[in-house]
Amino acid sequence: MNKPICSTGLRWLWLAVVVVILDISSKQWVMAHFALYESVPLIPFFNLTYAQNFGAAFSFLADKSGWQRWFFAGIAIGISVVLMVMMYRSTAKQRLINCAYALIIGGALGNLYDRLVHGAVNDFLDFYINNWHFPTFNLADVAISIGAVLVIFEGFLSPAEKNAVNKNE
């Protein structure tokens, strides 16, 4: 029951690799050029602000004693494995869903790298309106969010619409 990898959704894992490279590179640049919590305004609603998150999205569980590092690392590994199995079971022509899975995997692995190497996820994208700041995030978070939106979008497509999206292969 072995299938050539190029005929499966795993063919799209290159996108996950690109996300990991861009995410880790951008975080390394920020860590090399910013002190922790240093902020540089770029435009009236956006700063580059170096922050660390010991929890998950919106600093969920960030105030715990450290066990959450391994908990979230396990979740990232588990989700990545499940999505890779789903990609293997799909065809390479199912571009939308495979790209979505690859974005989520790339984001999960980018943040996993931070958790394992730095003990926390490094964030630096800071959007705000007046004094209200959206939680600081990074490129891995952007990839995960886009991937999740694409999964939801794909779920609303009819089979005919899915065929039209995936047709040009």
UniProtKB/Swiss-Prot annotation:
Species assigned in the record: Yersinia pseudotuberculosis serotype O:1b (strain IP 31758)
Protein name as annotated: Lipoprotein signal peptidase
Function: This protein specifically catalyzes the removal of signal peptides from prolipoproteins.
Transmembrane domains' residue ranges: 4-24, 29-49, 70-90, 101-121, 137-157
Catalytic activity: Release of signal peptides from bacterial membrane prolipoproteins. Hydrolyzes -Xaa-Yaa-Zaa-|-(S,diacylglyceryl)Cys-, in which Xaa is hydrophobic (preferably Leu), and Yaa (Ala or Ser) and Zaa (Gly or Ala) have small, neutral side chains
GO terms (BP aspect): proteolysis
GO CC term, one of those recorded: plasma membrane
Topology of the protein relative to the lipid bilayer: Multi-pass membrane protein
